[in-house]
Amino acid sequence: MAVIKCKPTSPGRRHVVKVVNSDLHKGKPFAGLLAKKSKSGGRNNTGRITVRHVGGGHKQHYRLIDFKRDKDGIPAKIERLEYDPNRTAHIALVLYADGERRYILAAKGMQAGDKIQSGVEAEIKTGNAMPLRNIPVGSVVHAVEMKPGKGAQIARSAGAYVQVVARDGAYATLRLRSGEMRKVPVDCRATFGEVGNAEHMLRQLGKAGAKRWRGIRPTVRGVAMNPVDHPHGGGEGRTSGGRHPVTPWGVPTKGYKTRSNKRTDKYIVRRRNK
């Protein structure tokens, strides 16, 4: 994988930094694992904007990813690595011995031709998935479930990983990249290794249009709006906003705590690093 800085042949190319991976499949994705993906423009069923800065972008198909890794005891071979427009990580097309194909997240170091497996009898090897009760303490894993059988929810983006730091009874303790320590049931599954494409963070789009290709619209400052649109809006000439920073709905920002799910507080051993 190479990080390439483009020549400044135009203002739009001057600041572009690309991450090029020659191992990725250059053809079409596997048609049997594609789903339609409709654009909402950030609107809900009533037509109102519920997510700001969303709209436009290139047409995409959703890739059906196997986050459960529940095909136990059947060896599989990685056919190829692919680009996925729906996530920062790359994905791998896996062919099982019984003929079924599935997409999984591509782990760091994973290559076409590698053998992987799921289940308690799988060996400790990058790309293999098993319950946390069978994973040695100190191991680095990704694609971790929070509820058994629900599918991976933790450490799914490019370069992400968590470390298993303890196991006590029905729960395993994980250290997340943010510094948070969290308890997860030992029957939850995880995959060995870290997610690939860690160089994604070095990418620079270089121009506003590249954001628009991805369906991301501009973010307008509140002080540049009218009073009807934002608490910071209005005033003659340039202003500072006239109050402590708030969201468009008046909720304080800049460090204001908004977490209210007390039901799951008992699973957080240590809060993330501020």
From Swiss-Prot:
GO cellular component: cytosolic large ribosomal subunit
Superkingdom as given in the UniProt entry: Bacteria
GO biological process: cytoplasmic translation
Location of the region described as Disordered in the Swiss-Prot/TrEMBL record: 223-274
InterPro entries named among the record's database cross-references: NA-bd_OB-fold (IPR012340), Rib_uL2_dom2 (IPR014722), Ribosomal_uL2 (IPR002171), Ribosomal_uL2_bac/org-type (IPR005880), Ribosomal_uL2_C (IPR022669), Ribosomal_uL2_CS (IPR022671), Ribosomal_uL2_dom3 (IPR014726), Ribosomal_uL2_RNA-bd_dom (IPR022666)
Keywords attached to this entry: Ribonucleoprotein, Ribosomal protein, RNA-binding, rRNA-binding
Any one GO molecular-function label of the UniProt entry: rRNA binding
Family of this protein: Belongs to the universal ribosomal protein uL2 family.
Role noted for this protein: One of the primary rRNA binding proteins. Required for association of the 30S and 50S subunits to form the 70S ribosome, for tRNA binding and peptide bond formation. It has been suggested to have peptidyltransferase activity; this is somewhat controversial. Makes several contacts with the 16S rRNA in the 70S ribosome.
Quaternary context: Part of the 50S ribosomal subunit. Forms a bridge to the 30S subunit in the 70S ribosome.
This protein's name: Large ribosomal subunit protein uL2
Organism encoding this protein: Shewanella oneidensis (strain ATCC 700550 / JCM 31522 / CIP 106686 / LMG 19005 / NCIMB 14063 / MR-1)
Organism lineage string: Bacteria, Pseudomonadati, Pseudomonadota, Gammaproteobacteria, Alteromonadales
Encoding gene, per UniProt annotation: rplB
